[in-house]
Amino acid sequence: MSLKSLLKGFKRPKKIEFNTEANTPNYGKFVAEPFERGFATTIGNSLRRTLMSSIEGAAISAIRIEGVNHEFSFIEGVAEDVTRIILNLKQVRIKYEPEEKDQSKIIHLELKGAGYFRAGDLAVDSSIEIMNPDLHIATLNEDANLVMDLEIQRGRGYVPAEEKKKDIEVLGTIPVDSIFSPVQKVVFEVSETRVAQRSDYEKLTLEVWTDGSVSPDDAVAQAAKILKEHLTVFINFEEELEEEDDELDEADEKLKASLSKHVEELELSVRSLNVLRSLEIDFIGDLVKRSEEEMSKSKHYSDQCLQELKVKLSTLGLSFGMRDF
């Protein structure tokens, strides 16, 4: 059975509404409607759990301080003990995009004399961005000579220091509890909504707070993709294409298969997907029938989005304005 036939009769959202006035780099409010009864709760709860546990982020994973062998130590010239310094470092929120997958980064710091050690001091190059640079780490007096290395890694969820001890190779390295998740809070609400004369449909309102290293809309998109990939294992049948005439050659069959795909299979950016949702375009066949002028009517439209769509279509041998197929 084709996807179109499978979804026939289901009321489902065509687009997501963004509260552009209230949204910030750390907060986003999203509204989707209508859903069949029960679906808004299912989707809202699934998104919330995935957002809180499975979005990748960066955190400090281990430290090494010159002259210190364990966390129950004191450093000459530093007001805070090592335990307090570690607790403060655990609160640092970091944006780090490695050049290679799973690549960690070592930050080397040398702080001498009186002053304050703040999170912003960790931004030693352009690959590191500290989201809370004013966070206090330690207070140094004129006798201080703090030399330390910090390891930054990417990961998911919460990883306790105990789990990292087996991977420590350098003497004096102290593992740190890592809170990788950039999502700090997620709240969803399900309420009734009306479609024509029926008021038993549902509206999903989703609010997301992040530390700023990932925008709320990107976090939601990542969570949705993670859920989608986990659900594909439960699809144990193939989408069947409509019966075709024997005279259709292989190229025609390939074209029809491409046109019947959902637009999400183009692997578009969040902004481009929002353009398609606002125009109620669900399938590639619907997309190629539109002209470039029609696409510009979306409030989410930009030249960059149009260029991305044109490139994605061209890889399938398609383009805008195709009406005769």
UniProtKB/Swiss-Prot annotation:
Listed GO biological process terms: DNA-templated transcription
Annotated Gene Ontology cellular component terms: cytoplasm; DNA-directed RNA polymerase complex
Region (Alpha C-terminal domain (alpha-CTD)): 254-325
SMART domains per UniProt: RPOLD (SM00662)
Region (Alpha N-terminal domain (alpha-NTD)) location: 1-238
Listed EC numbers: 2.7.7.6
Keywords carried by this UniProt record: DNA-directed RNA polymerase, Nucleotidyltransferase, Transcription, Transferase
Disulphide-bonded residues: none
Catalytic activity, as annotated: RNA(n) + a ribonucleoside 5'-triphosphate = RNA(n+1) + diphosphate
GO molecular function terms attached to this record: DNA binding; DNA-directed RNA polymerase activity; protein dimerization activity
Family: Belongs to the RNA polymerase alpha chain family.
Role summary: DNA-dependent RNA polymerase catalyzes the transcription of DNA into RNA using the four ribonucleoside triphosphates as substrates.
Domain comment in the entry: The N-terminal domain is essential for RNAP assembly and basal transcription, whereas the C-terminal domain is involved in interaction with transcriptional regulators and with upstream promoter elements.
Known partners and oligomeric status: Homodimer. The RNAP catalytic core consists of 2 alpha, 1 beta, 1 beta' and 1 omega subunit. When a sigma factor is associated with the core the holoenzyme is formed, which can initiate transcription.
Protein name listed in UniProt: DNA-directed RNA polymerase subunit alpha
Lineage: Bacteria, Pseudomonadati, Spirochaetota, Spirochaetia, Leptospirales
